[in-house]
Amino acid sequence: MDSKTVFSSPELTEQAINGAYQELAKDKGYINRLGCGYIGLNTDCEWSAWSTGTDDRSTTVTYSLTTNNTAISNKNGSDSWSYLNTVIERCNAIIDGVRQYGDTTDAAMRYYLGEAYFLRSFAYLEMVKIWGDVPARFEAISTDPESVYAKKTDRNVIYDHLRIDLQEAARLMPWSNDAEVPVTARNKVGRGNKAAALALLARADLMYAGKAVRPNTLEDRSEYSVRFNFEDNALRKEIMEEVLSACAAVINHEDKLAEDYAQPFRQICSDETAYDQMEHLWAIPFADGARGQIMGFNSPKIGSSDIVKLSGKIPGIGDGAKSNGHISITPYLLYQFEKGDKRRDVTCVAGTWAYDDKSVNGITEGTRAYQKSVNLKNYYLAKYRYEWMRRNSTGDDGIDFPVIRYADVLLMFAEAAIGSNTGITPDNKTNLNPLEQLNKVRRRAGLADADALSFDLIMTERAKEFTGEYIRKWDLMRWGILKDEVEKAERFTRSIMENTESMTVPLNGKEVTISATIWYKYRQDPALNGAWVMDSIYGLGNGEITKPAYFDKNNGWIEKTNIFGSEEKGWDFAKSSYPFYREAEQLNARQYWPVFTHYITASNGNLWNNYGY
């Protein structure tokens, strides 16, 4: 079928769009690599269970990657570099075809054209996030055959193009539930829309206006520095104002901030896709139970023998379900949560599902599922939970991968209003109060309003709001502080984990008093078939170091001592055990993935690695 036939038909053009989406759902793509902890870790907020290993998986999280990593690439091209480039090429063909043959006065064709610009921009932004400087190819290879060997390009060229393309995408695509959106895409969080395009523009702009690890010259294979992407402060101010404008357009159109912080994650886990019911602006869609292992990699760990016994007992856990417990939150983040912050107990859990036939840990009935308390190093990320699913997972869970939500728009607006940490303050022409946007997020978390905006406040709020959502690493990178913050997180962790008793330690210019003991009780949850859940946990907040007055071991309360580790020496935090990184000097040099060797070999000299790879 020729291009004229395809791109003069709205129905066939949508099939071409679906072909671009399909590339995001392949092995070693978002279903089990890019959405599953192989990127984005370790940070000051999240760390990986693989950090202790020496295999190729561990190098993806400890800043020690090599150019022949088999965990994320293989020589047959089945990897994220190939898939993202294919998304770009398919979108190039759609854009060229619709521009040449399509009727862009037709609402559906305008929408599909805008969605192609949006998907291409997303793929390019992901490539810049993962690899830094990559080839820029904005025309289909059929139009420009020589571009098959496109040369590595300065990322600023791509950023400049994304500014144009995402504004065009936002112009062409209506709001998600607008009548002009084709019915197959209308009100679907898994399809492009104006708000998602504007939010992605703001995200890309903040990266562009910020800092990055950059080679001294594009051709320099070894020398690099952390610096601004460009020196023109007038341009930086213009871009910050573009962020304000883009975010304001979304904020003024709709209030999508969920009342309950857990709601966006419950909805993702329960297959909600209605845009007007969700805080998320866009998520990569996967077929239910057919593709995707988001739950298996991102949920709290369940032991291999327990998960078999729990099948059919806990909602969401079916035969063959997996739970790797890949991501835990760091103590450095845990003790930054203010008293009463509702986000803490959604973001992490102090226990993991187990199945016990012997009635231990205060359980008076046998053959029940229960949450088993764990040590501090295993406080797992908990935004993705089997018990929130509406169907049972049998391995490929098919949970959609969320990309951006409304809270990010609010906090990006607040950040841009003060110029982030660039020293450049833009003119706010939107009539929106940036402090109010940040305080909307704090109020939802159950916290008092902040009195004034500052970069430190922005940095802390983004940590507590977005941990585990594959955002933090790139925040730290664009602020130019990843190395400093990861080293701080390790020093703090080392300072508490080598102890066995409660202590007072410095944290971000303040002192926190940390308990070595937690107290909790169990309650039965009828929604979980009577499973026992840890409840009323005390001892994780600053100053919670003495037994609560209401503690009564005769009334179901339990005391877990020394959450740091063994009774003798606390948690053995030797470099071979759970490091954040292998070598401190590599924290800048290995922020980006290398271009894999087989692509360089086949590039006719147009690809190479920087940063001393």
Show where each model-derived region lies.
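An aromatic- and glycine-enriched ligand-binding surface/loop that stacks and positions planar moieties
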Residues: 1-61, 134, 138, 159, ...
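Conserved, well-structured interaction surfaces
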Residues: 9-10, 14-18, 22-28, 32, ...
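Flexible, polar/acidic helix-loop-strand segments at domain edges
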Residues: 62-64, 332-405, 605-613
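Long, intrinsically disordered, low-complexity segments
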Residues: 84-87, 161-163, 185-188, 268-302, ...
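Glycine-centered coil turns and helix-coil junctions that link the paired helices
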Residues: 97, 127, 134, 208-215, ...
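Structural helix-adjacent loops and short alpha-helical linkers that scaffold large soluble proteins
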Residues: 102-113, 213, 238, 421-433, ...
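Alpha-helical scaffolds flanking conserved acidic
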Residues: 106-119, 190-198, 453-455
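Extended amphipathic alpha-helical segments enriched in small hydrophobics
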Residues: 121, 201-203, 398-446
